[in-house]
Amino acid sequence: SSDLRNLAIRGRKIIDKVIRHVEYARSEINAIGDYYAYAKELADGDAVFDFDVTKLSIFTRSLGLAGIEVYDLLRDEYDIQTEFGDIANLLAYVSIGDRPKDVERLVAALAEIRRNYRKDPSKTLKMEYIDPTVACGPQDAFYAEKESLPIAETCGRICSEFVMCYPPGIPILAPGEQITEEILTYIRYAKKKGCQITGPEDMSIQRLNVMTER
C-alpha cells in the first residue's frame, strides 16, 4: 500500500518528527507545574530496561487528581481523547498524523485543568502497587468452597476470585490472596475515581467471594 511504501522510504524521518513532538510536549507539560511527564531518566538498566519516548505518560497525583479524572476532563471538556488514565497517571499517544497544533492543544488543556480543577494532593491515594499476601495456590482457592460477603466484612479472608482495576487491568486481588485493609482502601478509591472494576461476580463490587473458613 502507499502507507507502507511511505513508511519504508520515509520511516526514520516520520518517527523522528513524532519524537520531536513528544519531547516538546514533555518539556512544556513539565513546565506547567504539578504534572510530571516521564522521560528516559526512568531507564536505569535494572528495574526499567528502556523507555519508549513516543509514549507520553504523565504523573498527575501532585495535581490532586487521579489520572482517570484528568482523562475524563480532557475527553468531556476539551474533546481530547487520550489512551487511558489510572489512579495516578495519564497516557497519551502522539501519532504520525498529529500536528504541532494538536500537541499545543493538549498542553493548553492540561494547563487549564491545573488552573481550574487542582485539588489538595494530600487527599490522593499514595500507593500504586500492593505486594500480595499469598495464602494458598490460585487453583485451590478458585475451586474451594466459597461464600459471598459484603466487601467491608472481607478483611483478613482469602479471596476466591479475581479483582482487577481497569486501567491498567492488573489484578488487585487473585484467588488465594489475603484481603487486607490496604487492598480494600485501594478498591474503594479506584471505584470512587471512576476506574472500572472487573473480575468479581458482583460487578458493583459491593460483595466479594471468599474461601469458606473451616
What kind of region is each of these model predictions?
Residues G11-V22, L56:
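Substrate-binding/catalytic subdomain of NAD(P)-dependent oxidoreductase enzymes
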Residues E23-G199:
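Conserved C-terminal alpha-helix-loop-beta "cap" of PLP-dependent enzymes
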Residues N6-I9:
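Long alpha-helical, hydrophobic tracts
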Residues Q196-R214:
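Charge-dense polyanion-binding interfaces
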